[in-house]
Amino acid sequence: MELLGEYVGQDGQRQRLRVPCEAPGNADHFQGLLSGVARMKELVAELFGSPVQGEAQDRVAAAPEEALDGDDEDDAEDENNIDNRTNSDGPTAKRPKPPS
């Protein structure tokens, strides 16, 4: 068993990743798969290490307060949608005023 991956860069260049998932000895096949996934993760991290780190640093330099929150959505839009909740179970949950 093996894991295969292929990355096509922005320039169109293809790079193939291949990781065998052989478990040592008579170990469980799932253990071999887990070790293969861990190795593939390492290869992908190596492949994307430099460009991803550079891109993250560029985002922080361009807009540090927005890059740190990790949210790509517009914060103003989030604030506008806070109270847009519906209650389909019945009337509103407001308490009636007690008689005076």
Curated annotation (Swiss-Prot):
Keywords assigned by UniProt, alphabetized: Acetylation, Nucleus
UniProt source species: Sus scrofa
Keyword Iron-sulfur among record annotations: no
Segments for region (Disordered): 50-100
Residues modified to N-acetylmethionine: M1
Pfam families given in the database record: DUF4611
Protein name: EKC/KEOPS complex subunit GON7
GO CC terms of this entry: cytosol; EKC/KEOPS complex; nucleolus; nucleoplasm; nucleus
The encoding gene: GON7
Top-level division of the source organism's lineage: Eukaryota
Biological processes annotated in GO: tRNA threonylcarbamoyladenosine modification
Keyword Acetylation appears in the UniProt entry: yes
Biased composition (Acidic residues): 66-81
InterPro entries on file: GON7_meta (IPR027893)
Job of this protein: Component of the EKC/KEOPS complex that is required for the formation of a threonylcarbamoyl group on adenosine at position 37 (t(6)A37) in tRNAs that read codons beginning with adenine. The complex is probably involved in the transfer of the threonylcarbamoyl moiety of threonylcarbamoyl-AMP (TC-AMP) to the N6 group of A37. GON7 plays a supporting role to the catalytic subunit OSGEP in the complex.
Quaternary assembly: Component of the EKC/KEOPS complex composed of at least GON7, TP53RK, TPRKB, OSGEP and LAGE3; the whole complex dimerizes.
Protein localization: Nucleus
Residues in coiled coil: none
